[in-house]
C-alpha cells in the first residue's frame, strides 16, 4: 500500500477537539495523509459573530486546500459546521464533510429522554432546535451548554488531571434525567471516560465521530488521489499554550510538532 497514491485529508477545528474525529477516521483509514489545522487565535468559535467565523474558516481552509493539494475537508466543529458548509461546498471542488450533534441516533436509542451536552452556541442555535424537532420530537430533550467542558478537554490533552468534582458540578443538571446523552461538541469525546464516570454506566453516550469516519471512508473510495505517503502535519493560527505538553500528546497520535499557520 505504501507505493500507491494516498489521499490528503484536512481536518479543521477551532481547537484540539477535532482530534477526536481524527481518531475515528484514522481507525478506518490509517494510510491517509492527515493535515490538522486549528484556529486557536479565534478560539472559542462560539463567541464569534457568524460573519467573522465564516470569513476566517473560508480563508484558512481555501488557502490550505490549495497549498497542500487536499482531497477532502472535514470541518470537525459543530459551531462552524452549522455556518460554513454551504459556502465551502460552493467554493471548493472537493468534498467537505461537517459534523452535527448525533440527535437522530440518540433518539432511536433513548427510552426516556435525550440529553444534549454541547457549547452554549450549539445549544441555542436554530439548527440544533430543528434537529430536535425533526428527529427527537417524541422524546424529552435536556439541553446543557458548557464552555468550561471545552477548556477541560484542552487541558486534558496537555496532560492536566481532570477534576471529577468540577465535572460532576457541570453535568449535575443532566444526571438521573436522561438515558442517552449526546456529546455535541468534538472536544467532548476526549472526556468520554470521565463523563461516563460522572453520569454512570447506565447512560449511553453518543457522538458523531464514527458516522463522520464512515462518510469520509465512503467519499474517499470515489476519489483518485495523486499524493504519495507523507508525515502527518498539524498547524495552529497562533502559538498554542503549553505547546510542549500538547506536542507530547500529538506525537502519540502520529503527528509532527505543531507548525504556525497564521491567517
Curated annotation (Swiss-Prot):
One of its GO terms (molecular function) is glutamate racemase activity. Keywords: Cell shape, Cell wall biogenesis/degradation, Isomerase, Peptidoglycan synthesis. It holds the Pfam family Asp_Glu_race. Substrate binds at residues 13-14, 45-46, 78-79, 186-187. Its EC number is 5.1.1.3. The active site is at residues 77, 185. Pathway: Cell wall biogenesis; peptidoglycan biosynthesis. The keyword Transferase does not apply. GO terms for biological process: cell wall organization; peptidoglycan biosynthetic process; regulation of cell shape. SUPFAM superfamilies: Aspartate/glutamate racemase. Signal peptide: none annotated. The keyword Lyase does not apply. It catalyses: L-glutamate = D-glutamate. Provides the (R)-glutamate required for cell wall biosynthesis. Belongs to the aspartate/glutamate racemases family. This is Glutamate racemase. The gene is murI.
